[in-house]
A protein has these predicted regions:
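Solvent-exposed, non-transmembrane regions of integral membrane proteins
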Residues: 1-728
């Protein structure tokens, strides 16, 4: 039996190494992903699975039926994957309007015949109102007398063949992903169903280790110390800009920005954040900053407010600090300093930094030339409403002369009012423009409620002060609690109540941000790095409050985790910009997949902080073995729901992927690292196979080290590796 144990766990360790190395090699050579579907790697999985099943039987795991069912479900899932690898066909089919085909191109370039012909009756793109952002791709199909449609997240199935709308080509034809997997999907889904049922069975079983720990651990009065608040200050500015009243009136206009109609305030806020990293600059609001660049470009071109992160680009521009002015982008003979490096960007030392600097210069250039202010709604010959700027050359030819002059000359008139200081006339001008927008914008305009909600969101969404406060409070509370516990002391009740109040207030504030973001964007806010980190911060507090009775250290941990994740969100890990969702992302399965995994990550973070707390206690008092053992039991208790939720989240993502593009596992780096994380933490369940995990300090060390896989899954993949999940 020892040989079987070493074989199964040894092969799993080898598989983990191959998985991790493969994701890194994909960054260098995209063809490296082929290793995951190669015969030798499939054989490695097969031998591991067979040896693991044999080890389960020899160790009589079947005497603990819930645990046996969990392990058996993974064997069924792997059997389904093997069946798909042996029998399935995947490829691409391109059809033009009115054309039909009875074959498709496989991934390896060969051609596979279908037992029927498929005809594309019509293909159409549905757009978000008033924009050029695609909302859905819809193909109307017919075959064997059967009519149907294929669109994003809506599969057309016929005789075992599944057709997924993946896009369209330059000639207006439709592009489908074709999947023919009549056996593998059924086996795999059966494994998913067995996994879900067995997880529920295990968690409810009275004989499981989880329930044993739940009964054993009882609440003990422990708490935390008080809070440290941070004050923020602002200063007045001498830079030329609109007065606050007129700037707010300008921000109250509608504008086409980010493929949607929103308050111009939103554009101003993100314009300012993009340039300098904050929503305000030198005591001026975002609307005032935008107005300064719009009406006083010469003065503002001298101001060093463009944040340059790259040291290489700073050297190229010849600046000493981190901020550049527009004039720094030009030489003494008026040559654009980035022009030549951009031509040979592959040879530049920091191409990403160069692109970011060029993008910041470009958004200023587009604003000052009037191209980015698309504030004028106009109808074309078909009655379709589009939004245009003063600098656009594609204004509909049907536009009458008076309206054409209004579009082309109104901002010049506004500039004249600004230069002569006629502020009341400027207010009247903005009022008239807004009336024009409401009269001609039609169905493209957001509702008044949504418009006001977005302005409220813009006002409250800067959570940096909150994040700083929570991190300071959480750090002081966390380490104070650890030191008190090591000495056998208790913090005062008022400190605990204060910390609870801070945690609840923070949770309510973040809840307001999330609800506003959800309402304004029209989708669950889990589509990018900013939104998922904000959701993780939101999860941290209720988890801490629920766990506090049995694990008192959870409260300061929750405050600290909430602060750290909020700060990461505010640092702009994904440029927090609301935009219309890509069609493939409009799925409730995706939202459930992200939400479940984020809750799992929050639990794993608590376990890592438990480990850190144990090491702090050990350094302060080597006799604090009882407290360290209790922390270990708390981490063990959290380990079960954390890994179970992570597992469910991974396979929810697999189902979503299969529904969306016909492949429930595509070896994307994010998928691979989520799998690595799940396996790494699953090792910790096997105390019988790894007796050293029973030792408290060894267990805590493993939990701290294992959390690095979570960090790499989120940050490493998002910002260093490539793939469909990369946010950077």
């Amino acid at each position: 039996m020892r040989v079987l144990k070493k074989t199964s766990f040894g092969l799993m360790a080898i598989i983990l190494v191959v998985l991790a190395v493969g994701t890194i090699l994909q960054k260098i050579d995209s063809s490296a992903v082929a290793a995951y579907t190669s015969p030798w790697f499939v054989a490695l999985w097969t031998v591991m699975a067979v040896s693991a099943v044999a080890y389960m039987l020899r160790s009589r795991l079947y005497r603990r039926l819930p645990a046996f069912a969990v392990h058996a479900s993974f064997a069924v899932i792997l059997a389904g994957a093997l069946t798909s690898w042996l029998t399935s066909e995947h490829g691409t089919l391109r059809l033009k309007d009115g054309a039909e085909a009875s074959a498709f191109t496989l991934d390896d370039g060969s051609v596979a015949k279908m037992p029927f012909s498929l005809k594309l009756q019509r293909f159409e793109i549905e757009y978000y109102a008033g924009t050029e952002a695609p909302m859905d791709f819809v193909s109307h199909l017919s075959t064997d007398g059967v009519n149907g449609t294929a669109s994003m997240n809506n599969v057309f199935s016929h005789r075992g063949y599944r057709f997924y709308q993946s896009g369209y080509d330059s000639e207006g034809g439709s592009v489908f992903t074709v999947a023919h997997d009549p056996m593998g999907i059924g086996v795999t889904y059966a494994g998913y169903a067995l996994l879900l049922a067995s997880i529920c069975w295990f968690m409810m079983s009275g004989k499981s280790r989880f329930r044993s720990l739940l009964r054993k651990l009882s609440a003990k009065p422990l708490a935390v110390v008080g809070a440290l608040m941070v004050a923020m200050s602002a200063q007045a500015s001498d830079l030329p800009a609109l007065p606050q009243q007129q700037a707010e009136e300008m921000g109250n206009l509608y504008v086409l920005y980010g493929d949607r109609i929103c308050p111009l305030q939103t554009m101003a806020k993100e314009f300012t954040e993009k340039l300098c990293g904050n929503a305000t600059f030198d005591g001026l609001s975002a609307e005032q900053v935008l107005s300064g660049w719009l009406y006083y470009p010469t003065d503002w071109s001298k101001v060093p407010m463009i944040k340059i992160k790259s040291a290489e680009v700073r050297r190229l521009l010849g600046i000493d600090g981190k901020y550049a002015s527009v004039r720094d982008f030009f030489s003494d003979v008026n040559e654009y300093k980035l022009e030549k490096p951009l031509r040979g960007i592959d040879r530049f030392a920091d191409p990403q930094g160069l692109r970011e600097a060029a993008e910041k210069f470009d958004i200023i250039n587009r604003l000052t030339t009037g191209k980015s202010l698309k504030i004028f709604p106009l109808k074309d010959a078909e009655g379709k409403i589009g939004w245009f700027s003063q600098g656009d050359d594609n204004i509909p030819v049907e536009t009458d002369t008076q309206e054409w002059m209004f579009v082309k000359m109104s901002l010049s008139y506004a500039n004249e009012l600004v230069q002569t200081g006629r502020w009341s006339d400027l207010s009247d001008f903005y009022t008239k423009v807004r009336k024009y927008q409401r009269k001609n914008g039609g169905a493209t305009l957001p509702s008044d409620t949504r418009f006001k909600a977005e302005k409220t969101y813009n006002t409250v969404s800067n959570a940096r002060p909150l994040a700083i406060t929570l991190m300071c409070v959480g750090l002081v509370a966390f380490f104070s609690f650890c030191l008190l516990s090591a000495r056998g002391g208790r913090p005062r009740r008022w400190a605990v109540l204060t910390l609870r109040a801070i945690a609840v207030a923070a949770w309510l504030y973040i809840s307001v941000i999330i609800v506003l973001l959800w309402f304004v964007s029209g989708h669950i806010p889990m589509s990018n790095g900013y939104e998922t980190m904000l959701f993780l911060a939101w999860c941290a507090v209720p988890i801490a409050m629920l766990a506090e009775r049995r694990m008192p250290l959870a409260l300061p941990m929750g405050v600290l985790l909430c602060g750290m994740t909020t700060m990461v969100a505010m640092m702009g890990i994904s440029n927090p910009r609301m935009s219309q969702l890509m069609p493939v992302l409009q799925s409730p399965l995706l939202s459930a997949h992200v939400a479940v995994i984020m809750v799992a990550y929050a639990l794993l973070a608590f376990m890592a902080m438990n480990g850190i707390a144990a090491f702090v206690m050990r350094m302060r008092n080597r006799a604090a073995t009882d407290e360290i053992t209790v922390l270990k039991e708390h981490s063990e208790l959290l380990l079960y729901p954390a890994v179970m939720l992570l597992t469910i989240g991974i396979f929810l993502g697999a189902v979503w992927a299969n529904v969306s593009w016909g492949r429930y596992w595509g070896w994307d780096p994010k998928e691979v690292w989520a799998l690595i994380t799940m396996i790494v933490y699953a090792f910790a369940f096997h105390r019988e196979s790894f007796p050293w995990l029973r030792r408290p300090m060894a267990f805590h060390a493993y939990m701290v080290l294992a959390f690095f896989s979570v960090l790499f899954t989120y940050f490493g993949v998002n910002f260093f590796l490539t793939g469909m999940h990369s946010y950077a």
